[in-house]
């Protein structure tokens, strides 16, 4: 069993914490990454956390996860 969890983040999520914090909050994507990695470690999983502003790259990553039989979490934006 593959213990890798891909966490894929889509367009503009790199701006979390800076762009309209009154709407989206002050938590940055890096803070979310750190929390995700800590939780994965507690669960004996490997977190592969990524962000892209390009839909084609996201599709490539989804196919990569499929080829590796990895779990997948997607935050499209």
Task: Identify what each model region corresponds to.
Residues 7, 17-18, 73:
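Unusually extended, aromatic-enriched hydrophobic runs near protein termini
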Residues 37, 41-77:
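Helix-adjacent hinge/juxtasegments
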Residues 16-30:
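Glycine- and acidic-residue-enriched helix-capping/strand-helix junction motifs
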Residues 13:
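ATP/NTP phosphate-donor binding region
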Residues 1-5:
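Extreme N-terminal starter segment of soluble prokaryotic enzymes
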